[in-house]
Design a protein with these regions (language model features):
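Short beta-strand and strand-turn-strand segments in soluble, beta-rich domains
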Residues: 15-18, 53, 57-77, 120
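Asparagine-centered strand-capping/turn motif at beta-strand->loop junctions
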Residues: 38-44
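Short, surface-exposed loop/turn segments at beta-strand-coil junctions that are enriched for proline
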Residues: 94-100
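N-proximal low-complexity "stem/linker" segments adjacent to membrane-targeting elements
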Residues: 131-157
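Short beta-strand-to-loop acidic/aromatic patch adjacent to the donor-nucleotide binding site
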Residues: 165-180
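Conserved donor NDP-sugar-binding/catalytic core segment of glycosyltransferases
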Residues: 178-213
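A recurrent flexible, glycine/aromatic-enriched loop bordering the glycosyltransferase active site
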Residues: 216-238, 243-259, 263-272
Length: 274
């Protein structure tokens, strides 16, 4: 564990002295962990009461100290920490989006009342370089249905060519799906930024499909709170597509609708019905 240097410790009932820490390398959007050794340097015990009482948490700040994520997940103490007692705690840490330079500020919070920093204690602030979620930009493909020459031609024009070996993300298309040239780049950009699932906009050829798929029409921008399943999604390892409106889909969390990643869709002729 890395030793923490000297820092101000107030006199009073609520005070913390940080002794040491160990931090797993954060990646954008990925749940990691940290181990902290800290001392109750005040005169009052710390007691966690389920989700209330004294909890360990953190803020993600930008390099200037502005809050990017104010409320990190809470970690309760398994038992009361008495004045003068030193404990080690393992805490979950969720990497912020997008990757980049941040400051990770650990603090204690008296839930629904105040952070210890607000009553004079110093948080443990660490400079952190958050890495992209994916270590390599390698996009593979699963084609649902029969091979299609026009789809194959569109894939051959991609700004970032698709790979067959060791992909880190896999996109799901159907025959007659014609991605725009920047489609693969935009999917990989979003995965790097921290999303496990990314789906683009659908631009159908037929009027019937345009009405049916109006919620996925181009022009919607980027939306991490999209109210519909992603269609023709790109998924990181371990995620599998389902089916919605006869197309491969994904309806889980940790997902982004990328309205600039456009896939033109021929009429249903030659595609699986569903």
């Amino acid at each position: 564990m890395e030793r923490v240097g000297e820092h101000p410790v107030p006199v009073g009932p609520l005070a913390v002295r940080w002794h040491a820490y160990e931090l797993e390398q954060p990646r954008a959007g990925v749940a990691g962990s940290a181990r902290l050794r800290l001392e109750n340097a005040g005169t009052a015990p710390w007691r966690s009461r389920g989700r209330e009482g004294v909890q360990l948490s953190y803020h993600w700040l930008d390099p200037l100290g502005n809050a990017i994520v104010w409320d990190g997940p809470r970690t309760a103490f398994p038992s009361a920490v008495q004045p003068g007692e030193t404990v080690e705690v393992e805490a979950g840490v969720l990497g912020p989006r997008p990757p980049g330079s941040y400051r990770l500020a650990f603090d204690l919070v008296e839930e629904l009342r105040f952070w210890f920093q607000e009553v004079g204690s110093a948080p443990l602030e660490l400079p952190v370089d958050v890495q992209p979620r994916i270590s390599e930009r390698r996009l593979g493909l699963v084609m649902h249905g029969a091979p299609d020459a026009e789809t194959e031609a569109a894939l051959n024009t991609q700004e970032e060519p698709l790979v067959e070996d060791e992909p880190v993300a896999v996109a799901h298309l159907v025959a007659g799906a014609l991605p725009e040239p920047d489609w693969s780049r935009r999917l990989l950009d979003a995965h790097e930024e921290g999303y496990a699932a990314v789906g683009g906009a659908i631009d159908p050829e037929s009027r019937t499909d345009r009405r049916r798929l109006v919620s996925w029409a181009p022009g919607g921008g980027r939306n991490p709170r999209f109210g519909h399943p992603l269609l023709l999604p790109s998924l990181l390892d371990g995620l599998q597509p389902e089916s919605h409106e006869g197309l491969p889909s994904y309806a889980g969390s940790d997902a982004l609708f990328e309205g600039r990643a456009i896939v033109r869709l021929r009429s249903r002729s030659g595609r699986p019905s569903g």
